[in-house]
Amino acid sequence: MIKIWIDDVRPAPKGYIWIRSVNEAKRFFNSSIGKNRIVALVDLDHDAGDFASFGGDYIRLLDWFEETGRNYPIRLHSLNPVGIQNMRRVIIKNGWKEVK
């Protein structure tokens, strides 16, 4: 089982795979590693900062999960309260599990 940390600035905690952009995340989830391992948790920031030009802010990854029928446990660690509200709406709409 793997844990994914998606954030442009804050380093991943020990035991997580650190991904910095939406495009990098898509490549990972489409790779043999992403397809063949159980994802225990996707821990997401909202604001992609300098990495936004590589696929947008991280809410775009939730949109992509929805489009591709993916369902992973998700934790939100953003400091952006509006961003968290917007991401939480996508999580609730899809019936995904939010880990707090």
How would you label these PLM feature ranges?
Residues 1-100:
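Catalytic phosphate/metal-binding cores of nucleic-acid and nucleotide-processing enzymes, i.e., regions
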